């Protein structure tokens, strides 16, 4: 996140080499980058640059996700020493402690000219197939270089039947239940409670009464393994 911000702020076009060393590695998972450090380093040395989109959230940049609501706080609130010791499990345990604090957030979104408004339990504007290592989007509907975000909004289920329906829709990646809104868009304008915090690539971002989120098409180049069939 900081590297991308630095490059774009400087107007540089330097290819980025990425070694996944985090607890969840959503970004690497979506790009199918090796999680083995030596293999990742080899990809940087022997690979080739491939162009990818990034997001701009107001005045900040993000590589793969801007999210709000349930369980998003755990990504930045979990102490680093706990992440180091427990890895992805640390996020799960932290998420459990958040259960009593979960609430709906009233949000209005203008998505490429269409308006969506309601009380949402969770929302994500992403360019990734994996969010938090728990929620996985359909790879067939996610292209990290097509100039579009995937937007997923989850309304709070009101009974056990709706909970089951919502979980089933997320697991099947069909997104066809009443609690879910799934769209693709290049630009989103958001109106929300300015006290509602956001998470950008796992880092805390203060709330905004109004903020515009824009997909920057092919804004970065990332080193990837060469296509041997090309």
Q: For the regions a protein language model found, what residue spans apply to each?
A:
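Gly/Ser/Thr-rich active-site loops/lids in small-molecule metabolic enzymes
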Residues: 82-90, 130, 139-159
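ATP/nucleoside-binding phosphotransfer catalytic cores, i.e., glycine-rich phosphate-binding loops
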Residues: 111-112, 117, 143-146, 153-230
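Glycine-rich nucleotide phosphate-binding loop and flanking beta-alpha elements
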Residues: 25, 129-131, 196
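Short acidic/glycine-rich loop or secondary-structure boundary segments that cap or lie
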Residues: 72-74, 117-119, 131-134, 159-163
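Glycine-rich phosphate/pyrophosphate-binding beta-alpha loops
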Residues: 67, 71, 124-140, 204
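Glycine-rich, charged/polar anion/phosphate-binding loops
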Residues: 50, 93-96, 105-112, 133-139, ...
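Catalytic core of DAGKc-family lipid kinases
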Residues: 1-125
